Regions:
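Beta-propeller fold detector
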Residues: 34-36, 77-83, 120-123, 157-162, ...
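Short loop/turn segments that connect beta-strands within beta-propeller blades
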Residues: 69-74, 112-116, 151-155, 196-200, ...
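Beta-strand-rich domains and repeat architectures in extracellular enzymes and scaffolds
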Residues: 33-65, 80-92, 240-242
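A short helix->beta-strand "capping" segment at the edge of beta-propeller domains
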Residues: 23-41, 71-75
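Conserved beta-strand positions in repeat-built beta-propeller and related beta-rich domains
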Residues: 56-60, 98-105, 140-144, 184-188, ...
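Hydrophobic, well-structured mid-protein blocks that either form specific transmembrane helices
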Residues: 108-165
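Blade-loop segments of beta-propeller domains
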Residues: 74-110, 116-128
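Beta-rich, blade/repeat-based domains predominating
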Residues: 40-51, 84-95, 124-141, 166-180, ...
C-alpha cells in the first residue's frame, strides 16, 4: 500500500514539474536594427528568402500576387498576378518548387522556384493560412490551433496541436522555420510565438507592439503578418499587411 502511495506521489510530482516547465514561456520584445521600404499595396501573406531576394505572396481577391522582391528597395523585380477568384495565402520553397496556398478556394499551386513558371494545381482540403518547411515537410496553418505537416503532394503526415501554458492557441497565421523552431504570427495581434515542432508547446512569445509607428500608419494599414529568416546572414525580418516598412529585428528578453 505504501509503495502505491509512493508511486502516486512521484507521478504527481512529475506531472506538476512538467506542467511548471510547460508554463515557463520566455518573453521577448523586438529591437529594430534596420528598416527598409515595403510595398504598402501588398497584403502580405507569405514571405521568405531566396538567396538575396525575397519571395512574397499577397492576398485579397483581385490583388493576389507572387513576387520576387529586392529587400533593399521593396520593389518587385518579377511579379505574377493571380485570377480574381483566388485569394492567395502562405508560401514557401521546397525541393525546387514554390508552394502557395489559397484561403477558401480549396486549391494549392506549385511554381518553379527558379523561373516562377506554373507547374501544377493540387486540391487542398482546408483553409490555407500560413506555410513553411522544416526542409523535409511542408508545415501549414489554417487559423486553428493545429499545424499540419504535409508532403510535396499535400498529403498529411501528421497534425500538431499547439498549446501555450497548456491551452490550445488558435489564430496561427504566417509561419517561418528558424533554427529548428516554428515561428508563427498570431492573427489580429502584435504577437509572434515560437513553437517546439516536436510537442507543439509555445516556448517563447515575441511582442511586436509599436513596431510600425503611428506616423507610418493610415486607414489601410492592417495587422502584423510576415516573418522572413535569411539563413545565410542569420537575420530576421518582419512586416505586415499593407505596411510601408520591412524591419530587420533582434530579440531582447523582457525583464
Amino acid at each position: 500500500m505504501r509503495w502505491k502511495l509512493l508511486i502516486l506521489v512521484i507521478l504527481t510530482i512529475i506531472a506538476l514539474s512538467a506542467s511548471s516547465c510547460e508554463a515557463k514561456v520566455r518573453q521577448y520584445k523586438v529591437k529594430v536594427v534596420k528598416e527598409y521600404p515595403h510595398d504598402e499595396m501588398s497584403y502580405t501573406q507569405g514571405l521568405f528568402f531566396q538567396g538575396d531576394k525575397m519571395i512574397e505572396t499577397t492576398g485579397q481577391y483581385g490583388e493576389s500576387t507572387l513576387k520576387v522582391v529586392d529587400p533593399e528597395t521593396g520593389k518587385a523585380v518579377k511579379k505574377f498576378s493571380f485570377a480574381r477568384k483566388y485569394f492567395c495565402e502562405g508560401s514557401v520553397e521546397l525541393d525546387g518548387n514554390i508552394y502557395i496556398l489559397t484561403w477558401r478556394e480549396k486549391v494549392a499551386f506549385i511554381y518553379d522556384a527558379k523561373t516562377l513558371e506554373y507547374k501544377q494545381t493540387y486540391s487542398y482540403p482546408r483553409e490555407g493560412w500560413g506555410l513553411t518547411t522544416d526542409g523535409k515537410n511542408l508545415i501549414a496553418s489554417d487559423g486553428s490551433s493545429r499545424l499540419y505537416f504535409l508532403d510535396g503532394q499535400f498529403h498529411q503526415q501528421k497534425a500538431l496541436q499547439v498549446k501555450m501554458n497548456g491551452r490550445p492557441l488558435s489564430q496561427l497565421n504566417e509561419l517561418e522555420w528558424i533554427d529548428g523552431k516554428i515561428w508563427a504570427n498570431v492573427y489580429m495581434t502584435d504577437m509572434i510565438v515560437i513553437i517546439n515542432p516536436d510537442n507543439g508547446n509555445v516556448e517563447a512569445t515575441v511582442d511586436c507592439t509599436g513596431l510600425l509607428p503611428r506616423h507610418l500608419r493610415d486607414e489601410y494599414t492592417d495587422v502584423l503578418n510576415g516573418i522572413a529568416y535569411n539563413p545565410e546572414t542569420k537575420k530576421i525580418y518582419l512586416t505586415g499587411k499593407y505596411w510601408k516598412r520591412l524591419y530587420e529585428v533582434e530579440l531582447v528578453e523582457k525583464k
